[in-house]
Amino acid sequence: MITVDRKTIIQILGGIMARPELLSDIDKYQLEPSDFSQQLDKFVFSAIYNLYVGGAEKIHATDIDTYLGENDIAKNIMERENGTQFLLDCEIHSEPSNFAYYYRKFKKLNLVRELQKKGYDVSNIYSEDPLEENHFSINEKFEKLNTGDILNQIKGEVADLENRYVINTFVKEGTAFDGVKDLIASLQI
């Protein structure tokens, strides 16, 4: 199953820690807990979101650690997965000015993962296996794609199948005035 690499996750979470106002820019960025596959990341994202909604303008690792410490499940996950160090990595190693790049990469990988979950063959879109023969060329193309391009590729494949297997699909065209004279004549007494 395709996963998003930890460095990209660090850039995403660190970027919104430094600039939580990005969460309000819903025309450009749409993030939600389900975008993250690991439980720790979901808790961290939710904490950042809730701190921002509560009025925080810049969020530090200690803010998130304190916030999650109030939830026993989150606290246990933080302890088990070295969450405090992860938060510090997000704070220190992210570059908020590169957020847009990492966001696009993050969303593309999530889309491909979702397609894979639904049973689509994504091997011609993205390759996780560096030993695969076409790994480099596939991923080079992937870098140039956006989510719309990926979905259009899938739609094109489905349209090809539809053209091959769906028979007798035609559309009868007309206008709003077709049959109006007959209707008026039938209504006159």
Features from the language model and the residues they span:
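Charged, low-complexity surface segments at secondary-structure and domain boundaries
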Residues: I48-N50, N139-E140, V166-T169
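The Walker A/P-loop phosphate-binding site
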Residues: N152-I189
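Generic preference for flexible, low-structure residues
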Residues: K28-Y29, Y52, K118, V122, ...
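Noncatalytic partner-interaction/assembly domains of nucleic-acid and motor enzyme complexes
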Residues: M1-L109
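Bacterial replisome coupling helices
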Residues: K7, D65-Y165
